[in-house]
């Protein structure tokens, strides 16, 4: 009986020690300013080099809305050189023309399917790592504008093109056509001020592709 009590006491001591022991578990949840790599993995910036990965984009938004597709958005490290939204005047690209919809991916596919959008073609041509990049909608690029100051440091650390505040370098195409003027104009967005501008679609402007994450 004494031996039984001794064994029971030993088990209780082990159990209490296990419960009281503090353990730090790594926080693996995706966060703003994490890095999307060419293998599709999202890691902390500090882990890019140690894991031998190649960065391609920076996470700028984590989705909290179940009605929004994906778990977040990442912005590509580099700008695409200025291209026209459309090389033909008077043609609709059949985007939603909604400035509140998070539908840049669908808009970009509509632009590309028209066969008349140099901007969309340039984005499709950059899919060298299997990442489905697209031109952000007005609603999506507004999210990027809100996170610009945070992600710019990491874009720079990864060797990318920092999002400029210079008036002559801050304007980017969105994938959203202007409602009731779809055949002539699309929205241009300033990542310096957050301003929107109706712009003739044949004008060349820079593009900053983004990607929807499903991590």
Model-identified regions with their sequence ranges:
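Positively charged n-region of N-terminal signal peptides that target proteins for export
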Residues: 1-7, 20-21
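Processing junctions and N-termini across compartments
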Residues: 2-3, 13, 167, 203
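An exposed tryptophan-centered "aromatic clamp" motif
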Residues: 119-132, 138-191
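Hydrophobic helical h-region of N-terminal Sec-dependent signal peptides
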Residues: 8-13, 78
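Short, compositionally biased
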Residues: 19-129, 201-215
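Short hydrophobic beta-strand that contains or immediately precedes a catalytic carboxylate
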Residues: 75, 135-136
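Terminal interaction module
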Residues: 26-27, 103, 107, 163-171, ...
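C-terminal motif of bacterial Sec signal peptides marking the signal peptidase cleavage site
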Residues: 14-18
